[in-house]
A protein has these predicted regions:
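ABC ATP-binding cassette signature C-motif
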Residues: 1-225
Length: 225
């Protein structure tokens, strides 16, 4: 069971968003998560990272698992009094200055931009920095929750190309259909508290979602009649 645990002593119940989830990630899998808003896609991602405690069951990581995780809320954890250069340097104190500067240049922080205060950055610049910190750690499993929000067109295309050439495992939540088409080769559908393989493409999912919404409207009208 995946969801949010009620607080002890306040009488609140566990909020179960996903139930009886049984998934296996194989090396090289490239999976896009599809599902209505609020169905539990982000909950699944957080549970796989270990950020969200399982309500029931267990998570069994591989021996050499190295997770790279990006979600919009991580922008808030950036040290706004620091710089992109220092953020990377903290991760790898022995890395050379030139190595760090070359790496950051690939994410748009060229020259003096690598030494600008994060507090002065736009949402897009902060998103680029957060993605750079994920990439620097060389993960073999990428868990990405709406990574293109705030990114301009150039950086979206750069991210798409980087993910397409990434040799590890990818699980991606995104409304960017171009990104999904270019970087994943299978889909899981998250709906009705379940996570299941979706045998179809994005057009098939659009048809499924439209039919679901129409059925929901009919049910709603029936209740009001």
């Amino acid at each position: 069971q995946l969801g949010y645990r009620g607080k002890k002593g306040d009488g609140s119940d566990d909020n179960i968003q996903l139930d009886k989830v049984n998934v296996t990630l194989l090396p090289g899998s490239r999976i896009g998560l599809l599902g209505p808003n609020g169905a539990g896609k982000s909950t699944l991602i957080k549970s796989l990272t270990g950020e969200l405690e399982l309500l029931n069951g267990k998570r069994v990581p591989g021996e050499h698992l190295a997770i790279g995780y990006f979600a919009q809320h991580q922008l808030e954890s950036l040290d706004v009094s620091s710089t992109p250069f220092v953020h990377v340097q903290r991760l790898s104190p022995t890395a050379s200055d030139q190595e760090i500067r070359n790496f950051l240049g690939g994410f748009g922080f060229k020259g003096d931009d690598a030494f600008g205060k994060v507090a002065n950055y736009s949402g897009g610049e902060k998103a680029r920095l957060a993605l750079a910190l994920v990439a620097w750690q060389k993960p073999n499993l990428l868990l990405l929750d709406e990574p293109t929000n705030h990114l301009d067109l150039e950086m979206r295309e750069a991210l798409t190309q980087a993910l397409a050439s990434f040799e590890g495992t990818v699980i991606l939540v995104s409304h960017d259909r171009h990104l999904l088409r270019a970087t994943v080769d299978e889909f899981w559908r998250v709906a009705d508290h379940r996570v299941e393989p979706f045998d179809g493409d994005l057009e098939d999912y659009r048809v499924w979602l439209k039919a679901r919404l129409e059925e929901s409207r009919r049910d709603s009208r029936g209740e009001k009649a």
